[in-house]
């Protein structure tokens, strides 16, 4: 699926792993329903809650033009107690 780009491993996302919350970068046009269905079917887990936010645009200059690259959306996915995504397992 092209809508889920990759998992995010930052200080905040590693702290959230202790609360059974996983962070992914997703496509800007994707919605929570599509992402929830894909996560539940692909990883065989139960999604309890989802939060999303857009990353801020970073301005830059290309010659005399000011450009704002398109950023992606970030989803924080909370799973049911006992479920985990093997991609983030410590083993």
Swiss-Prot record:
One of its GO terms (biological process) is translation. Signal peptide: none annotated. It is found in: Plastid, Chloroplast. It comes from the Eukaryota. One of its GO terms (molecular function) is structural constituent of ribosome. Keywords: Chloroplast, Plastid, Ribonucleoprotein, Ribosomal protein, RNA-binding, rRNA-binding. GO terms for cellular component: chloroplast; ribonucleoprotein complex; ribosome. Binds to 23S rRNA. Belongs to the universal ribosomal protein uL23 family. Part of the 50S ribosomal subunit. This is Large ribosomal subunit protein uL23c. It comes from Pinus koraiensis (Korean pine). The gene is rpl23.
